[in-house]
């Protein structure tokens, strides 16, 4: 006998790729490996990635999150300290060395590439224009690679219009890795209109994961009654995905950290849901949200595959002799 359901039908357009990128995987793995090799506590300067679920999971394993190296107690000065995936100014490792601290730099290799691009511009005599968001840890880290005054932050096309450089013919730009691809292109166009000699970095600064996730959302947003992005409010790449969904045609687009944040009373009647996750959001939260909708709807999953990601960034040599258990790997990969 066929069973019937009184639940309304709902198609979930599930983006792939979504969630953790290679840089996030690597950063989380570094903290877990350090805990297994050296024991707790392992100190982490700033949130290793911008996601509370991940941070709280690492805290439960013995990680201690700090904002300044001066917060490390004297009795734990031999404990490892990990720098977050967003990168740090040059002054931070210098401070760690001055304090005789053992540090592990979990800066995403693609962020490190931007640092090198900025330094190359300076070596070639160019003033560096950094396209990014003021106050973001990645921007602070990139600006801190060069002497004060060597970098100018450009956040908007209006900033580009106001810019008065000392030498308009000696400019080079780099970008934060997690920006809106479309917004960044507009800022670069505005800069080039005013400064035709503006030099680009040797390679694209916006990372593959940012681009892939934005393209996936753009492809799946048209006609969606609601689009949910799993991510934290302080996650730049997650907030950009919300904006992309709105621009691409989703009726409503929201950022949520957990299923408990879904505003059921505001959703109304929906038949199509778009779903993706920022690069620092674990897959287990995506599963949690799908389960929450299954409780209220007769769900059909429409998997929208727009790219295949094979990138893998190895950890530093000092941690490669440590083996992770299947449970460790599940956490590192966002599945637990």
Swiss-Prot record:
Keyword 4Fe-4S in record: yes
Active site: 138 (proton donor)
Residues that coordinate or bind (2E)-4-hydroxy-3-methylbut-2-enyl diphosphate: 50, 86, 136, 177, 235-237, 280
Cofactor(s) this protein cannot do without: [4Fe-4S] cluster
One Pfam family from the record: LYTB
Keywords linked to the UniProt accession: 4Fe-4S, Iron, Iron-sulfur, Isoprene biosynthesis, Metal-binding, Oxidoreductase
Residue positions binding dimethylallyl diphosphate: 50, 86, 136, 235-237, 280
Pathway: Isoprenoid biosynthesis; dimethylallyl diphosphate biosynthesis; dimethylallyl diphosphate from (2E)-4-hydroxy-3-methylbutenyl diphosphate: step 1/1; Isoprenoid biosynthesis; isopentenyl diphosphate biosynthesis via DXP pathway; isopentenyl diphosphate from 1-deoxy-D-xylulose 5-phosphate: step 6/6
Molecular functions per Gene Ontology: 4 iron, 4 sulfur cluster binding; 4-hydroxy-3-methylbut-2-enyl diphosphate reductase activity; metal ion binding
Binding site residues for isopentenyl diphosphate: 50, 86, 136, 235-237, 280
Co-factor note (free text): Binds 1 [4Fe-4S] cluster per subunit.
One GO-annotated biological process of the protein: dimethylallyl diphosphate biosynthetic process
Record EC number: 1.17.7.4
Function, in words: Catalyzes the conversion of 1-hydroxy-2-methyl-2-(E)-butenyl 4-diphosphate (HMBPP) into a mixture of isopentenyl diphosphate (IPP) and dimethylallyl diphosphate (DMAPP). Acts in the terminal step of the DOXP/MEP pathway for isoprenoid precursor biosynthesis.
Family: Belongs to the IspH family.
Cited PANTHER family: 4-HYDROXY-3-METHYLBUT-2-ENYL DIPHOSPHATE REDUCTASE
NCBIfam families: ispH_lytB (TIGR00216), PRK01045.1-4 (NF002190)
Protein name (record): 4-hydroxy-3-methylbut-2-enyl diphosphate reductase
